[in-house]
Amino acid sequence: MKKFLSILLSAVMVLSLAACGAKEATPNGDQSNTVNEDGTRDTYVTIKVGTGHNKNSFFYTGLAEFERLVEENTKGAVQIDIFTDGALGSEGEMAEGLTMGTVDSGLLGSSSVAKLESTFNVFSLPYLFENNDHVDAVFSGEPGQLFRDKIWDSQHVMILDYWDSGFRNYSTNLHEINGPEDMKGMLIRIPDNPIQAATAAALGASTSTLSYNELYLACSNKTVDGQEGPVFAFVADNFFEVQKYMVLDGHIYTVMALMINGDVWEKLTAEDQEIVMQAAKDAGIVEKDAIRSSQAEQIKYLEEQGVIINENPDKQAWRDATASVYDQFSDTYGADLIDQIKNYPY
């Protein structure tokens, strides 16, 4: 009998230890689903999100909405901390940090995304998109998913959503820009991007890639003749003080990608992943609407400041003038992919 009781006691102890072990092995995700009496959940992940822009930017408007939606819908289990003004590094540094795990999340422009997947530069081809509806269809459709998959598979970085940085336009302090022929002989500052350089060259312009921080002064002292960028940046950075002519040619659309490191992403429960992904999408709508709905007012403001704007250029003339850029890069990015994007239904 004593032997039986001893065996029984040993069995109970083994089962008890096994139960304790099973509890300790419970995935963090299961524990994180516990709801407190006040309806909140304990925070189990804090995601630091970086941007190179300041709190007055449309990008911050979107990130603040992302923060609100994530924290509200996860009941506080997932917290978002936003770092502005390049506090987590430049966009290029954040791109590298996302792959190394030293950056949790970041909002990156297309040239920085291309550091993770070089073929992402396909979106820099001139006059690739007809309008915002075309843009939205492409990035929410198969081409956008293609690059989500590529970057996840190769870099273990997830694109949560594609946001907006607008169509880029040329401006100068020399003369009105009525057509592509008016670009000949200009020295234009561009980002360090081979497609942008080829586009300017096709228009007969030469280029400089000086730092954006130096651009206002360079325009002021006429070190460069002009620059290019979206309307909201032209207003925000006061280029209307040193550039009096603009054409709304929309030669390149610049997408922004809200990205997250794969290890951070995989810390989230499946339910919270859905919440974060949906929050990125909904916040992206807010960011896009803020940029797009403000353009008419910004154009009016620029005209009040004396800027002469060609609002309705002959887009086909600009496409024809830069057709050689497609010949130059079709092998690099693939003619089929380029055609798919150009002709994507919207």
Regions found by a protein language model. Give the residues of each.
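C-terminal motif of bacterial Sec signal peptides marking the signal peptidase cleavage site
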Residues: 16-19
